[in-house]
Amino acid sequence: MPRSQKNDNFIDKTFTVVADILIKVLPTSNREKQAFTYYRDGMSAQAEGEYAEALQNYYQALKLEIDPYDRSYILYNIGLIHTSNGKHGRALEYYYQALKRNPSLPQALNNIAVIYHYRAEQATEKYQSEVAKILYNKAADYWNEAIRLTPTNYLEAQSWLKQRENI
């Protein structure tokens, strides 16, 4: 049974019904509709913490989806799962791929910055100050770009950047 038919809560059911209606009425190809169905099922599985199932759905969606903008969100979500699983290197690969297709994806920029900041903190703990400095600078670059795109978001990053200027 497809995940879209297993949703138990009201919001998921409502989203599924609306999405199914849109899929039926929008003038899109069967391939695009199928890609969206996999993407939707991936989001549902991801929301429930079923990461392996979500990845399977996202990979299927990637095989079918041809629109670069839509692919960027699939790639971004794959990056999120790898981040959640602690596979930061893999996550970065997917975030970079997402940005290549959609440079105006501030959440990918933010997540890249978070990973670099985390790695900088790890380097600091290992007394690798030069490595930490490079990683902090990378984090700052990505956060600055994310903030440029969405100035009212990422308040913690903005605060960190301001503190950093005063050091």
UniProtKB/Swiss-Prot annotation:
Annotated GO biological process: photosynthesis
TPR repeats: 35-68, 72-105, 120-153
Pfam family, one: TPR_1
Membrane topology: Peripheral membrane protein
Keywords: Chloroplast, Membrane, Photosynthesis, Plastid, Repeat, Thylakoid, TPR repeat
GO cellular component, one term: chloroplast thylakoid membrane
Subcellular location: Plastid, Chloroplast thylakoid membrane
Matches recorded under Gene3D superfamilies: Tetratricopeptide repeat domain
Function: Essential for the assembly of the photosystem I (PSI) complex. May act as a chaperone-like factor to guide the assembly of the PSI subunits.
HAMAP family: Ycf3
Protein family membership: Belongs to the Ycf3 family.
Protein name: Photosystem I assembly protein Ycf3
Organism: Tupiella akineta
Lineage: Eukaryota, Viridiplantae, Chlorophyta, Ulvophyceae, OUU clade
Gene responsible for this protein: ycf3
